[in-house]
């Protein structure tokens, strides 16, 4: 059971969805957040403005960091993935969306940490059919 002192990891924390999750968690009183992302973009910096958290960890450093620091993590929201449907480099998708997600899952499984994983691009694709969750159009949606 989570309480306000629980430590929560949010991957993709500087992106649109991840930063909204950080805002939501802050509003619920959670501030012991470990933010994981690639923090090299000024727009992402704006997404984190006024957010409360413990530390930011670069995505590629995260597993070395947890091995070294051994934080007591109570929950992981894995929202970090390459969702850009115009990215055609398969190796990037393979690394970020498959291999990295598997490493997150393994980390959580080994350490008995609850995990929530979500990605919207697989449903909405480039958005040519809109961004509706109406069940009538679900069959037409694809990445």
Question: Can you say where each PLM-predicted feature lies in the sequence?
Answer:
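SDR active-site strand-loop-helix element
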Residues: 11, 36, 76-80, 115-121
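A short helix->loop->beta-strand "cap" motif at the edges of active sites that frequently abuts
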Residues: 30-31, 110-114
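Catalytic helix-loop patch of NAD(P)-dependent Rossmann-fold dehydrogenases
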Residues: 95, 99, 103, 110, ...
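NAD(P)H-binding glycine-rich loop region in Rossmannoid oxidoreductase-like domains
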Residues: 59-96, 125
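N-terminal Rossmann NAD(P)H-binding glycine-rich loop of SDR-like oxidoreductase domains
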Residues: 8-28
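Local beta-strand N-terminus motif with an aromatic residue
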Residues: 5, 53, 72-73, 112
């Amino acid at each position: 059971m989570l309480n306000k002192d629980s430590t929560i990891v949010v991957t993709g924390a500087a992106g649109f969805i991840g930063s909204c999750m950080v805002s939501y968690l802050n509003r619920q009183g959670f501030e012991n957040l470990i933010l994981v992302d690639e923090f090299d973009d000024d727009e992402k910096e704006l997404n984190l403005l006024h957010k409360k958290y413990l530390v930011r960890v670069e995505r590629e450093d995260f597993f070395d960091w947890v091995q070294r620091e051994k934080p007591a993590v109570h929950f992981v929201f894995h929202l970090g993935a390459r969702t850009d449907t115009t990215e055609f480099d398969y190796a990037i998708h393979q690394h970020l969306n498959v291999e990295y997600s598997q490493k997150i899952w393994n980390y959580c499984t080994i350490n008995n940490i609850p995990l929530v994983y979500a990605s919207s691009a697989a449903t909405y694709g480039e958005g040519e059919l809109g961004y509706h969750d109406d069940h009538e159009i679900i069959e037409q949606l694809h990445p």
